[in-house]
Regions:
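Residue-level detector of conserved, well-ordered beta-strand and adjacent loop positions
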Residues: 44, 56, 103, 198, ...
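N-terminal beta-strand motif that seeds the catalytic metal site of vicinal oxygen chelate
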Residues: 1-20, 65-66, 124-166, 179, ...
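Intrinsically disordered, low-complexity, positively biased terminal segments
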Residues: 2, 19, 51, 59, ...
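Short, structured motif recognition centered on aromatic/hydrophobic residues
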Residues: 8-12, 26, 31, 43, ...
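Short, charged/polar, Gly/Pro-enriched secondary-structure boundary elements
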Residues: 48-53, 107-111, 118-120, 202-208
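Vicinal oxygen chelate
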Residues: 7, 15-20, 38, 67-151, 195-196, 244-255, ...
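Core segments of cupin and vicinal oxygen chelate
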Residues: 4-50, 160-208
Length: 255
């Protein structure tokens, strides 16, 4: 039985030597500054979450870890009993709240958080879909997509590469209560090379996955995903970032 069942991904935590450069990129990407200190940058989406991306200032650029929302404050005390876990502690950062810090099998930090400050949602104008059929038929209305980035709504999922996929997935399921949505294997079912996992929120519908672990020779962050209002935003913002000529395209549309 899992120690607790987290409800959702809260944020990704990174380190970088230049907070100005990070803020510029993340703003181009569609995030909005929630807070900034001399040593850290906190970026938000349009949903009420105080922040969904944290960058700590450091000499080296690297991935620190992921944070997840606890289902209750009592769950912090429960997960603090996990091997190697910190005590329940106050978060001395913008947004406040409490947390427990853990290390997953590849050494990355996992935070379980509760009681963070919520912000007012940022209003975003939505263009209704044009189906050619009432009531969604936009007769006589010209559609123009904005040239600036579409504001990101929320953080979606995080993906880790790991040499030991089964061990990593077992830790997340036993500790945070994830449920397997789809597993990928080669040959035998015990030769697991990828695993999509979702939060266990009972009868409440959740995303297909909040965590994906994929086999890789070295452990590391593969990507973090963010939700935008519609597919137009995915393609349009991909072109917007490409036109800036400042960033390296990684893979597909949107990365």
């Amino acid at each position: 039985m899992a120690l607790i069942k987290v409800r959702d991904l809260a944020w990704a935590r990174m380190r970088a030597p230049d907070l100005d450069a990070m803020e510029e990129f993340l703003t181009h990407f569609g995030l909005t500054r929630a807070a900034r200190t001399p040593t850290a940058l906190y970026m938000r989406g349009t949903d009420p979450a105080h922040h969904i991306h944290v960058t700590e200032k450091a000499d080296d650029a690297r991935f620190v870890g992921l944070a997840y929302h606890a289902a209750s404050e009592d769950d912090l005390a429960r997960v603090a009993k996990a091997p190697g876990a910190s005590a329940v502690e106050s978060i001395d950062e913008p947004g406040g709240g409490k947390r427990v810090r853990l290390r997953e099998p590849n050494g990355y930090q996992i935070e379980v958080v509760w009681g963070l400050q919520a912000l007012a949602p940022i209003p975003v104008a939505h263009t209704p879909m044009n189906t050619g059929v009432e009531p969604l038929r936009r007769a006589g209305t010209l559609m123009r997509l904005r040239k600036s980035p579409t504001p990101i709504k929320r953080i979606g999922h995080g993906v880790l590469g790991a040499p030991k996929v089964s061990e990593t997935v077992r830790w997340f399921r036993d500790t945070l209560g994830f449920i397997g949505s789809d597993d990928i294997y080669v040959g035998q079912k015990d030769h697991l090379i990828g695993s999509f996992n979702r939060c266990d929120c009972g009868d409440e519908y959740v995303d297909h996955h909040v965590f994906f672990c994929v086999m890789n020779e070295r452990a590391g962050l593969n990507h973090v995903s963010f939700e935008v209002p519609d597919v137009d935003a995915v393609f349009k913002d991909h072109e917007y970032i490409a036109r800036l000529g400042k960033y390296e395209h990684m893979w597909g549309v949107g990365r």
